């Protein structure tokens, strides 16, 4: 297919058959409903419809819609010409997400998924390698930050497939990785929106002390008291605290 690749949509289509097979075979899909974000020219989709129970794909590029409809005529395939970020998520059956997403909207898509985590069980998502390293980073790692804490609140995460830039067309300027998410069923009874804002506040100036970031929102004496209660130094920095401690901090300060 001759296609006018759109930089505005961040189009880099996965071409490598070996990588495609690794993605599709990573988890059993025979009895699963799959949601694919950005099927592109359908290289991954074509195998997904053969391996899974049902595939629902969201494609924003109207030029690709007739091509995909012609290429993939499987009865278990549903194609939506729709922006996933603007779509309403309300499924009767939980789905597995499989996606090769544009780098420039990675965070937007991830947080759309996190906000609707109850509709999904697992996800395999292709991201820029640098983002993958941030997603899986633990406290005291140089890659550890608000994305690490926020993402790990919703899911257990690991990097499972390294994908060189040569596996795509057009070829991007960076390497990628597939990240595996297992969404947690036991997320605490917590105000998720408020917690995510709290984490953003904690990491607002990552190189500064945590207390310095928090004092813009909370009373300084209360911050000192809570840090002392948790046996944390007043000098502690955001990247030195793990997810479980952040959850306790949130409860104590609110």
Curated annotation (Swiss-Prot):
GO MF annotations in UniProt: 16S rRNA (adenine(1518)-N(6)/adenine(1519)-N(6))-dimethyltransferase activity; RNA binding
Catalytic activity, reaction form: adenosine(1518)/adenosine(1519) in 16S rRNA + 4 S-adenosyl-L-methionine = N(6)-dimethyladenosine(1518)/N(6)-dimethyladenosine(1519) in 16S rRNA + 4 S-adenosyl-L-homocysteine + 4 H(+)
Compartment annotation: Cytoplasm
UniProt-listed Enzyme Commission number(s): 2.1.1.182
PROSITE patterns: RRNA_A_DIMETH (PS01131), SAM_RNA_A_N6_MT (PS51689)
UniProt xrefs under SMART domains: rADc
Tagged with keyword Transferase: yes
The entry's keywords: Cytoplasm, Methyltransferase, RNA-binding, rRNA processing, S-adenosyl-L-methionine, Transferase
Pfam family of the protein (one): RrnaAD
GO CC terms, sorted: cytosol
Keyword rRNA processing attached: yes
Binding positions for S-adenosyl-L-methionine per the UniProt entry: 12, 14, 38, 59, 83, 100
Job of this protein: Specifically dimethylates two adjacent adenosines (A1518 and A1519) in the loop of a conserved hairpin near the 3'-end of 16S rRNA in the 30S particle. May play a critical role in biogenesis of 30S subunits.
Family the UniProt entry places it in: Belongs to the class I-like SAM-binding methyltransferase superfamily. rRNA adenine N(6)-methyltransferase family. RsmA subfamily.
Protein name, UniProt field: Ribosomal RNA small subunit methyltransferase A
Source organism per UniProt: Mycoplasma mobile (strain ATCC 43663 / 163K / NCTC 11711)
């Amino acid at each position: 297919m001759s296609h006018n690749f759109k930089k505005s949509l961040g189009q880099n289509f996965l071409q490598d058959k070996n990588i495609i097979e690794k993605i599709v075979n990573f988890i059993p899909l025979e009895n699963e409903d799959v949601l694919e974000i950005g099927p592109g020219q359908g290289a991954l989709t074509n195998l997904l419809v053969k391996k899974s129970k049902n595939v629902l794909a969201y494609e924003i590029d109207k030029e690709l819609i007739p091509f995909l409809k012609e290429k993939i005529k499987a009865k278990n395939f549903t194609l939506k010409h729709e922006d996933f970020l603007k779509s309403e998520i309300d499924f009767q059956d939980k789905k597995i997400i499989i996606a090769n997403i544009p780098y420039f909207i990675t965070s937007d898509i991830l947080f759309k998924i996190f906000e609707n985590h109850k509709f999904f069980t697992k996800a395999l998502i292709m991201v820029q390698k640098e983002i993958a390293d941030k997603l899986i980073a633990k406290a005291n790692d140089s890659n550890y930050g608000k994305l690490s804490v926020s993402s790990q609140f919703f899911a257990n995460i690991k990097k499972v497939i390294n994908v060189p830039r040569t596996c795509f067309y057009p070829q991007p300027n960076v390497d990628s990785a597939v990240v595996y998410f297992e969404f947690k069923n036991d997320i605490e009874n917590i105000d998720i929106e408020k917690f995510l804002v709290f984490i953003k506040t904690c990491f607002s100036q990552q190189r500064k002390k945590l207390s310095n970031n928090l004092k813009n929102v909370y009373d300084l004496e209360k911050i000192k008291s809570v840090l002392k209660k948790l046996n944390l130094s007043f000098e502690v920095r955001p990247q030195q605290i793990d997810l479980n401690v952040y959850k306790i901090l949130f409860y104590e300060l609110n």
